[in-house]
Amino acid sequence: NDPAQNDAAGQIAERTLAGLWRLGAFGLQVPCELGGLGLSNTQYARLVEVVGAHDLGVGITLGAHQSIGFKGVLLYGDERQRARYLPRVTAGEYAAFCLTEPASGSDAG
């Protein structure tokens, strides 16, 4: 991974993302039985901190995928929802979060 190259290109290199998927980095807190690594909050935070210290864009990508992306399903989804969605977001499908605020602005972009 080359953070300067990622910044210049405005995106993270595909080979970096592919390597992170192979390592399980997109499912850090998902339970092992659903395809994740099953890390605790402390382990998750420390790992994203270390990654972000090297390349903030990669750290933010991992964090967004696992926080606003699928954290709601992880914390509040029923067993059927967890079994349906969590294996997918640990095996190569990016999680998404949609936001609309027609009368205000969070500047989420």
List each model region and its residues:
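Glycine-rich flavin
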Residues: 5-109
